[in-house]
Design a protein with these regions (language model features):
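Generic enzyme active-site microenvironment
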Residues: 88, 96
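ATP-binding/phosphotransfer module of carbohydrate and carboxylate kinases, centering on a glycine-rich
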Residues: 1-45, 54-57, 75-85, 100-107, ...
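A charged helix-plus-loop insertion that forms the helical arch/lid used to bind
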Residues: 60-69
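Active-site glycine-centered loops adjacent to acidic/histidine catalytic or metal-binding residues
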Residues: 90, 116, 288
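Short hydrophobic alpha-helix segments
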Residues: 12-14, 64, 133
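Gly/Thr-rich phosphate-binding beta-strand-loop-beta motif of the actin/hexokinase/Hsp70
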Residues: 1-10, 111-127
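Short beta-strand-to-turn element immediately C-terminal to the catalytic PLP-Schiff-base lysine
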Residues: 2-3, 97-98, 122-126, 130-132, ...
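A short acidic/small-residue loop/turn micro-motif
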Residues: 15-18, 68, 137-139
Length: 292
């Protein structure tokens, strides 16, 4: 529960088991009810941030991490919670939270890039979210990095997310492990693929493991180039970075920073402030609430 100043009054978390729409709606409903009970204040509306393409009000077109297509999540949640629901892309929500009460305070033009399980970005231009004609603008994770390349959860091939998103970094690390191609990865995860994380991949690359270095370097290069190109196109006042992968993989983050310095347009990066997201995991929920 968030007030109009962006302060969290109460919070509740619930572990997500089954990922079908009804199960997710019920999980969110239980967590929301607990947060409302803890806050003890009236709530006018509900904001929901989802890692999904949301081309129309309340409808998810594609949610790669959940395997969803064409799900009216907004209407389902409104029926469950009995309150108006605004459904927005998770990075749009995070960008709005950072703009209002985080690292973007006082700025009018932001580029927000998060790398976690996937790759996402959001754009604030002249103080407003830039979402495009179909509501799916700023989908950095789904620009084509390697046309015809690795399969992405969105159903297409060669997306940036398929190379640099956390889930896909782990998938590539597991492929190396299965082929016996990375002794360092095998040692770091005790030969258990289920234990692999992007941090293991970066550590193996740091140790000089050839195949881990190849995968990590490709991800870093593609991500850095994509962010640098966005800086050139958008000329933001601030670039805000966040997400678990960038937070816990400093080598990847450093490559992004170097890429912006080396490859973005000189005039576009003049005066650019590069900042870490201030609100951490709360940026999306605060932003979604403030947008509701």
């Amino acid at each position: 529960v968030v007030d109009e100043a962006g302060r969290i009054l109460a919070a509740s978390r619930a572990a997500l088991g089954e990922r079908s729409p009804p199960a997710v709606v019920e999980c969110i409903g239980r967590a929301a009810e607990e947060a409302l009970r803890l806050a003890g204040v009236p709530v006018r509306a509900v904001g929901v941030g989802a890692a999904a393409q949301i081309p129309s009000e309340g409808r998810i077109a594609v949610a790669p991490n959940l395997g969803w297509r064409d799900v009216p999540l907004g209407a389902l949640l409104q029926a469950r919670l009995g309150r108006p629901v605004r459904l927005v892309n998770d990075l749009s929500a995070a960008a709005w939270g950072e703009l209002r009460v985080g690292a973007g305070r006082g700025a009018q033009d932001l580029l927000v890039v998060f790398v976690g399980s996937g790759v996402g970005s959001a754009i604030v231009a002249n103080g407003q979210l830039l979402q495009g004609a179909n509501g799916v603008g700023a989908e950095l994770g789904h620009v084509k990095a390697v046309p015809g390349g690795r399969a992405c959860g969105c159903g297409e091939k060669g997306c940036l997310e398929a190379y640099a998103g956390g889930h896909h970094l782990v998938a590539q690390a597991r492929e190396l492990l299965q082929r016996g191609a990375s002794p360092a990865l095998a040692r770091l995860c005790a030969e258990d693929p289920a234990r692999l994380t992007p941090v293991h991949l970066e550590q193996a690359a740091r140790e000089g493991d050839a195949e881990a270095t190849r995968v990590h370097a490709q991800a870093a290069h593609l991500l850095a180039l994509a962010v640098a190109n966005q800086v050139t196109v958008l000329n933001p006042a601030r670039l805000i970075l966040g997400g678990g992968v960038l937070t816990h993989c400093p080598g990847l983050r450093e490559r992004v920073l170097q890429g912006v310095q080396d490859w973005s347009g000189r005039t576009a990066r003049e005066g650019l402030l590069v900042l870490d997201a201030e609100l951490g995991d709360d940026s999306g929920l605060i932003g979604a609430a403030l947008l509701a």
